[in-house]
Amino acid sequence: MNVQTGDTINYYMNKLILPFLNPKLFVCGDKPQVWRKALPDPTQYVNWDTVAHCFNNPWYYRTQILNRDGRRLHLPEKFEVWYERGVPHKEELFAAINEGYTFIIEQYGHYNAAVDNLLENFESTFDCNCDAHIFGAAKPDSTSFGSHWDIPPNFICQIEGETHWNVYEERCSGLIEMTDEPYLPDKNNHELTVALDVTLKAGDVMYIPARTYHKPFPSGKRLSMSIPCMYPLDVESDRKQYVIE
């Protein structure tokens, strides 16, 4: 919150008491974990109105669509004179979403005060820079990623609907570079060992350690928020909410 004191504004982070924001859980042993109903009021962070807002404003967010094979679609982009990067066509984005394709919104970490405050709690607890990534589908029978790994540790927050997950014992070594064509166990008939088999429901939170293989099995209309925690902390992100006097 903001407190007016003379000519200055003193800022105090809204400290969240959440079971997964506990360094003691991670200091000796790094394994996938789940906390049931651990995130109160999850739709304060993202809901279908905010999803529509982001896809109506692709100039300000990284918006993507997954194809039926679980790979990111390379949609045509246009370069407008006032913007420094290519922007996908909104009509194509909404057509894909309304057909039931899985969508992704990245660079969502400053969307609103609730998101900023949640990520500030992460960054004040752990040695990391965070973003928020939104995943979802508006129709049943959508597809998502196959078995894959990510560089940073990740917290998956189920916002709406349900998602079944497998998290595996296998990890990719830090010796291996992340590329646009990573090793895909599913395509190589590589059977992985399940460490965690779980279905997340609204308010549930799951932790996936760095470089650990994992795979979602989505069903039904759903929304989730991923919080990747890139370590170590590099440049602090200003998550304060300022006012104009």
Q: Which residues are covered by each model-predicted region?
A:
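Active-site region of the double-stranded beta-helix
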Residues: 5-18, 23-26, 41-45, 52-53, ...
